[in-house]
Amino acid sequence: MFRKRLVNKSSSDEKNQKKRQKINFSEEKLVASDEEKGSSDLMSLAKSGNSRTLQLSHENEGKLQKKGEDLDKYTLTVNDDSTKEDLLNFERKELAEKAKKRRPSDDNELVLNMSGKNKRLTKQINQPTNIRTTVLMDFQPDVCKDYKQTGYCGYGDSCKFLHSRDDFKTGWKLNQEWNADKEDSKAVTLDLEKIPFKCTLCKEDYKSPVVTNCGHYFCGSCFAKDMKKGTKCFICHKETHGSAKVASDLQKMLNKRKS
């Protein structure tokens, strides 16, 4: 504990005491400038009921303008490439934020180009990271055209192009032909169950087979001989009027069996 000493105060001590005043930190008050004090005084006058107009004098306006000019003198402006890029990025961010506020958030990504126009792109499909596929499209196979069409090339072995007469087909075309062959084979097998395996007139294999309107098959020569006797079918005795169609399906099946 400290005790106060009672000392006769002189005039010089009183002056020093005035200079060294205690500051109470519990009462936090902001120190106002002269201009703010003047404005606060004017506001207090207005609250008290005085009808004087609150206007800043020309001197105060001049002081404020001078201060603004002084601040402009000491502002630092750098026009480098780095600052330009930062400004561009800042403008882009502002445009993106404005666009997000205007439009509701969707699953689609929002992309902004340099002009600030909005472009919507579909969401990128997530692909597996452990698999990468590379596709090579050979639009110029370098095959000798003369040799492929005719089997002869004037350059002979010195020709720089490939001498090949193979026919290449795309995958979709091969699948289409495969499906067509399957359908044809199914149709043929269904019909063969009803078709006799030999001609009913000559009891031999079919030669240039024909089919009547009633669906019966005969050899072309056998059917012509039978039509001399009568125009009715030999099996079902229906009227054929002496006409018959070429059985192309049966002929294809017979050719496949021979081959």
From Swiss-Prot:
Signal peptide: none annotated. One of its GO terms (molecular function) is DNA binding. Its main location: nucleus. The keyword Nucleus applies. Pfam families: zf-C3HC4_2, zf-CCCH. InterPro entries: CWC24-like, Znf_CCCH, Znf_CCCH_sf, Znf_RING, Znf_RING/FYVE/PHD. It comes from the Eukaryota. A zinc finger (RING-type) spans 199-237. Present with 996 molecules/cell in log phase SD medium. Belongs to the CWC24 family. This is Pre-mRNA-splicing factor CWC24. It comes from Saccharomyces cerevisiae (strain ATCC 204508 / S288c) (Baker's yeast).
